[in-house]
Amino acid sequence: KYLEQYGHPKTVSELNKHKFISYGRGAPSPVFNPDWALKLGLKDSKKRKPVMKVNSVYGLLLAVQSGVGLAALPDYITVSVPNIVKVLPQVEGPKTEAYFVYPQSLKDTARIIAFRNFLYSKVSKWEF
């Protein structure tokens, strides 16, 4: 909906002509710096002004699906959503650290090793 009306940005500088949805301040975020696209390509501490703020990643997805504007969404939430288009695929998002915490005594158990390998295989494919 949104891209049909406003066009598909082809460069970072073209983002200035677009509307953005942001992750509201104060809301706990499952990823580091969810609003990184608001600063992308801008100098100093400048930031694009969002047209809407939401307090969840799922809220960002719903707003994008409704045609409100563009938002930075992690791949894990968009992978099975057919009508979401990745803009500027050549631009890499920020890295997010994740921790898998377990007692030292369980470090070498088959259960922990299998789960750690499973998590790594899934998480290593995600992009922001």
Language-model segments: which ranges?
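A late-sequence structural motif
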Residues: 88-128
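C-terminal regulatory
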Residues: 1-95, 124-128
